[in-house]
Structures are given as structure tokens and as C-alpha cells.
């Protein structure tokens, strides 16, 4: 009998319109096999990845847009084993709201591994710059620039979470999942520039708690 695939509940949160559903729908198998939970108004996408230690699966809980009507019910967070908080790099308010999502997530799930993702880096008019993205450093989260529409860095958050959950930094993804074709293109030179800016920002002291733009 085949061993059961290790499966983890991943809670995906962030303001409405930041691209959470677009992101999770990129994984075609997960999109095909998703299940709708009417009681919570949630779509659960089973996202499978092949690793050098065998298969691993994230059951990604997506709110299906109900976050637009206020906070999410605790049932959404309960038994969450890892999380992704998403904001839109073209919208400052979505980044300003990240601490609220983090507070809700950790209030129920406590000390779980969390990745902060800045989506839509394919859009040239970036508003949330590297030097202002400091929240992850204060709370010991991982951060990635992503572009859901172009599949840029799609696997990075899942790989980081998988390593944390399995407790092994030698874990690697050995086969790419089937992803939807890109509907946007990222400028690779610009992505390199963003990466360099994030590396540089990581060396800077954190702003004081009193600062208005302290996030």
C-alpha cells in the first residue's frame, strides 16, 4: 500500500484584488481538483509538488473574495499549518493592511511558517518599493516578489514552506507542476534590480516603531 502523501493546510490571506485566486489557479491540477466548502465560502485547491523526498501536498484555502466584506471567520484559519499573506505592489493600502492579516492569522494559528508575497511585479508602476517592505523582517517571515500572471517565482513560497514543515533545507522540487500559460511577462532585468534592492534593504536598520510608514 502506498504511503499517504504528507498534506498541509495552507491559509492564503490578503486584501481583495491582490491576486490570491489568480495565484492559486496557476497550478492546473489544483484548479481541476478544487473543492468548494459552502459552509465557509471557501475553495480548497490541492496543490501537489514532487520533491526529492517524494510527493507533498498543500491544501490551499482561498476565500473566494469574501474578505472584501470584512474579516474572515475563525473556521477559515483553524488547523492552518502554514500561511501566505499577499499584497499588491501597485497598491500601498494592501501592504498597509498586511499587519492586520498577520494578526488574524497568528491569533488562531500561532507560530506557523508564513510567507509574505508582493504580487503583480510584472506591472511597471510599482508603488511598494523594496525599502518599505520591512514587516517580514520584524515578524521573521519569508518574503518573495511574485507575479501570478507570469508564473514568476510561483514555486518559491511553496518550497520555503515545504522545507520548514518537513524540517529539511535539503528538500528540493524535482519536477515542475503543470502551470497555466503566462498571461503577462516580467522584465528579467527589472526582476534582477528588484532582487538587488531587496538584498540591499535587508542590510538596513529597521525603522522605529513610531514611524508613520513603519511596516
From Swiss-Prot:
Residues 4-168 form the Small GTPase Ran-type domain. This is GTP-binding nuclear protein GSP1/Ran. It comes from Neurospora crassa (strain ATCC 24698 / 74-OR23-1A / CBS 708.71 / DSM 1257 / FGSC 987). Keywords: GTP-binding, Nucleotide-binding, Nucleus, Protein transport, Transport. Transmembrane segments: none annotated. The gene is ran. One of its GO terms (molecular function) is GTP binding. Residues 65-81 are annotated as: Switch-II. GTP binds at residues 15-22, 65, 119-122, 147-149. GTP-binding protein involved in nucleocytoplasmic transport. Required for the import of protein into the nucleus and also for RNA export. Involved in chromatin condensation and control of cell cycle. The keyword Transferase does not apply. Signal peptide: none annotated. Found in a nuclear export complex with RanGTP, exportin and pre-miRNA. InterPro entries: P-loop_NTPase, Ran_GTPase, Small_GTP-bd, Small_GTPase. GO terms for cellular component: cytoplasm; nucleus. It comes from the Eukaryota. PROSITE patterns: RAN. Pfam families: Ras (PF00071). Belongs to the small GTPase superfamily. Ran family. GO terms for biological process: protein import into nucleus; ribosomal subunit export from nucleus.
Amino acid at each position: 500500500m502506498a504511503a499517504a502523501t504528507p498534506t498541509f493546510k495552507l491559509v492564503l490571506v490578503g486584501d481583495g484584488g491582490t491576486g490570491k485566486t489568480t495565484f492559486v489557479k496557476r497550478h492546473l491540477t489544483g484548479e481541476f481538483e478544487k473543492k468548494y466548502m459552502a459552509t465557509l465560502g471557501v475553495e480548497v485547491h490541492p496543490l501537489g509538488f514532487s520533491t526529492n523526498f517524494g510527493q507533498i501536498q498543500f491544501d490551499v484555502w482561498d476565500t473566494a473574495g469574501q474578505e472584501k466584506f470584512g474579516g474572515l471567520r475563525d473556521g477559515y484559519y483553524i488547523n492552518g499549518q502554514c500561511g501566505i499573506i499577499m499584497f499588491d505592489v501597485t497598491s500601498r493600502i494592501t501592504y498597509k493592511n498586511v499587519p492586520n492579516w498577520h494578526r488574524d492569522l497568528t491569533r488562531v494559528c500561532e507560530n506557523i511558517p508564513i510567507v509574505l508575497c508582493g504580487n503583480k511585479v510584472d506591472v511597471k508602476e510599482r508603488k511598494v518599493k523594496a525599502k518599505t517592505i520591512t514587516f517580514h523582517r520584524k515578524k521573521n517571515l519569508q518574503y518573495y516578489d511574485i507575479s501570478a500572471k507570469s508564473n514568476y517565482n510561483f514555486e518559491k513560497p511553496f518550497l520555503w514552506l515545504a522545507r520548514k514543515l518537513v524540517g529539511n533545507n535539503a528538500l528540493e522540487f524535482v519536477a515542475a507542476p503543470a502551470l497555466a500559460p503566462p498571461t503577462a511577462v516580467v522584465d528579467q532585468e527589472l526582476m534582477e534590480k528588484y532582487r538587488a534592492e531587496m538584498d540591499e534593504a535587508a542590510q538596513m536598520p529597521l525603522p522605529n516603531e513610531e514611524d508613520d510608514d513603519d511596516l
